């Protein structure tokens, strides 16, 4: 970090998993500037502080979209070594590892495992290519081999290079970038994710009869790639984001450089997704599928590095002090919401700067209402699910998280007030079944009007259950009050007749 003249700070390097930065400024003229906010802040926080929970969260949602049997899931999780076609056994792995160790000891960027330091060196090439996207045949026409070797030696030395000095041509830089990716120990998308990418390419739409069509399901493919990219190592994910953005911007200039997204995919698929140990015969079966997959990544690169909304919401609840955050089985029940709905709190905070304390109370009420609505919708969804093993599992987990929550309201002994346990499921049940529980609560509470035998108590009887104990007590009191009223009226008539007879006698 280097200090600037106005007291601010700028980041000269490439930050890993760009975290949210907050700048405090007292200059009133700058307060109108937009505030930079990272919507995936809590997602990255969860990844770094609780990686086991993060991995389980992402994998559980990824398996909703693609079918990964036990062995393939274990490969994705890194529990077993990936078994790919054309694998030559332990001997080849040993020699590859030995070569990687030798390269690592020399501190070489090319051919070494991917690190943030290596990305910082390669970023000089990416930044230069962003300024020369109009070069015709970029990434297709090879450059000068001598200039490329000189540039490669400079990068391996760890020095800052003035690529724009005019000594190098854009084709030299583009070819060297492909060379760097090709010499990585494994593809940029890793061997562990190879099977998952093949499964994502097979996600197709279904017709009205439920039959699988040949039309790709783009929405599910984007969601699956978003989740899969979250599982990449941080250096791989950072470089992949830089690379796909460069290729996306290059494809936008295809009218000048003659390089479409498909042409770029043909150039880069061997370096970012093809397994290193595959032969031509092994690859022939999936060649078109892999190339089309890279084309899809380039076209939709601006969406692939954002966490799905339900992942953001889970991470936010995890760090917001929620007593019982949503479990992995509940995530598929959460509806997909727009980012504006999930970040209304940010805009509310921004609007209440300098406001009165009452606005703070209003903000808390809005936050509480937002959470309650989400929980209410979640419980309703579970309640309306057809009877199945999954529903029973969700209900068991739901009750396990809140063991003290009563399933139904029980009778309360006279003279003792029932203390309701304020638990997660209890709050949801009270919100979803609010009207029914409110009516039962009224039936169990004897109001002053009912104690006096008023008409109000009589009207309330039709709103409560016949079997409710409150009905019995209320009717008993009403009967007693009616008897007292009859006795009072009889006594009053007796007094009036006695008084009248006394007057007649006196006359």
From Swiss-Prot:
The record's section on PROSITE patterns has:
RHOGAP
Query: Which positions are tagged coiled coil?
Result: none
Gene Ontology molecular function terms on file: GTPase activator activity
| Alphabetized Pfam families for the sequence | RhoGAP
Rho-GAP domain location is: 112-305
Write down the position(s) of the site called Arginine finger: 140
Tell me one GO biological process term: signal transduction
What are the alphabetically sorted keywords of the record? GTPase activation
Q: Name one GO cellular component term.
A: cytoplasm
| Transmembrane feature ranges | none
User: Where does the record place Polar residues bias?
Assistant: 400-413
- Bias category Basic and acidic residues: which stretches? 483-492
Q: What is this protein called?
A: Rho GTPase-activating protein 19
Q: Which organism is it from?
A: Xenopus laevis
What phylogenetic lineage does the species belong to? Eukaryota, Metazoa, Chordata, Craniata, Vertebrata
The gene designation is: arhgap19
